[in-house]
């Protein structure tokens, strides 16, 4: 396995625009190396007979019929506003002229 050097960590952190202190560079190098070793183990698994999936549990849309219903709640909701002008809420002006 290729050894992750301190220079590699510095380069990646610079590309990612992350500030890493010198005391943490070696720690991150070791962690990245462990991650790459784990990925190498995963690459050895035979997945030829396993179909590709996007998720572990299949998701199904639950649909219902649309029911047209007369509803006149607009006026009731507008009546709850502290200030109303016709079919609109009236709010204080926030932009200066």
From Swiss-Prot:
Presence of the UniProt keyword S-adenosyl-L-methionine in the record: no
Pfam families linked: GatC (PF02686)
InterPro entries registered for this protein in UniProt: Asp/Glu-ADT_sf_sub_c, GatC
Coiled coil: none
GO biological process: glutaminyl-tRNAGln biosynthesis via transamidation; regulation of translational fidelity; translation
EC number: 6.3.5.-
Family: Belongs to the GatC family.
HAMAP family according to UniProt: GatC
Reactions listed under catalytic activity: L-glutamyl-tRNA(Gln) + L-glutamine + ATP + H2O = L-glutaminyl-tRNA(Gln) + L-glutamate + ADP + phosphate + H(+); L-aspartyl-tRNA(Asn) + L-glutamine + ATP + H2O = L-asparaginyl-tRNA(Asn) + L-glutamate + ADP + phosphate + 2 H(+)
Protein name: Aspartyl/glutamyl-tRNA(Asn/Gln) amidotransferase subunit C
Organism: Prochlorococcus marinus (strain SARG / CCMP1375 / SS120)
PANTHER family reported in the protein's UniProt record: GLUTAMYL-TRNA(GLN) AMIDOTRANSFERASE SUBUNIT C, MITOCHONDRIAL
Keywords: ATP-binding, Ligase, Nucleotide-binding, Protein biosynthesis
Name of the gene encoding the protein in the UniProt record: gatC
EC class: ligase
GO molecular function: asparaginyl-tRNA synthase (glutamine-hydrolyzing) activity; ATP binding; glutaminyl-tRNA synthase (glutamine-hydrolyzing) activity
